[in-house]
Amino acid sequence: MHTPVSIYLKVRDMYPQSALMESSDYHAGENSLSFIALCPLASIGVNGGIVTANYPDNSRTEEPLTKTFNVEKAMNRFINQFQVTGDNKNVCGLYGYSTFNAVKYFEHIPVKESHDEQNDAPDLLYILYKYVIVFNHFKNELTLVEMLSEGEESGLPELEAAIENRNYASYNFSVTGPVTSPITDEEHKANVRKGIAHCMRGDVFQIVLSRRFIQPYAGDDFKVYRALRSINPSPYLFYFDFGGYRIFGSSPETHCKIENGRAYIDPIAGTTRRTGDTVKDRELTEALLADPKENAEHVMLVDLARNDLSRNCHDVRVVFYKEPQYYSHVIHLVSRVSGMLNEGADKIKTFIDTFPAGTLSGAPKVRAMQLISEIEPHNRGAYGGCIGFIGLNGELNQAITIRTFVSRNNELWFQAGGGIVARSQDEYELQEVNNKLGALKKAIDLAVKLKN
């Protein structure tokens, strides 16, 4: 039986710089699709204020961003150069990410520069792939989609042979040192207290402060992804290989989804640990739902999502509110906000106007991001940005980049944070970060034990 993971293991060495996106719900009629994208045809990236576009004819353009040539225009111009006809054209689009750092192209936000000379990863990168393997788990169907120029010979026979191949390389994973963090527990608690002080002064109502961890390793980081997806199945499971670095994770949160003329944001605000004991978890859920601090934070972020969508939408409504959702190590409170796109509204602009998520920045959003840049000791990179798909028709589905690893130079970087309000307590906020990182740390431990 073919699964997304089993096929990915077979094709990844033959088709480097590939992407795997899985659904964790194989039995639902909706959201039961998984994808493997192979063989980059074209790409658009932004780094250092320069837009770089690569095309199927091997041509390349570089152009600086200006007041009149912004990311929205660059993305739309790139997308509009590709016209796709035929079946399954809805899966032909751009797969990639926007880092939290990309906000500097959308708002006047200072972002700490990276001092890592080896870190040449773009702030924003989306790729158009030649092949997309589509799994419909509900119908138990597998479809191979190929993008061909007129007169071009198909490469599907080679792909089909790779899928049926039973002899493929496998690799081990091991850790080569302890997990470290650029800041200590006490330093993170001091940062939390700074956030509380800004809330008390009225600079912000809420601010999300995070902390990074680093795990040195050797071997195959795909083992960590496999462990994570088994420990912590989430609505968004993904493994992107960009050559010199990988981004992979199991995100529970939709940043922005646009389909059939409606835009959706699913804010998560309110988190408690999960014990695995049904009775105890029910008690923890009831306490979370009744907690004044968590309720105030949730209301604030639902309102922020409504405001973000209202910039380009009408009929903005709350679809469901404070729904408890259960994951391996935590319980979250989740709402869904949706709006109908205004006539003539640009879908890319609608996406950009929601970025970054309020649940990863704070409220008011711009001031919160300015303070984050002052308080956190490093730029966030991928953490708190988004990752996913942008269709050539502008429809999109982007997850928030949380519960995520960035793998580079034999190091795994992972990060978590919490929403700080005036009544927050530093020790509780430290524990919330540890709760959120529980699944990631457990995945590393399990990956070491996984045999080929």
Regions found by a protein language model. Name each.
Residues 1-452:
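Extended alpha-helical targeting/anchoring segments
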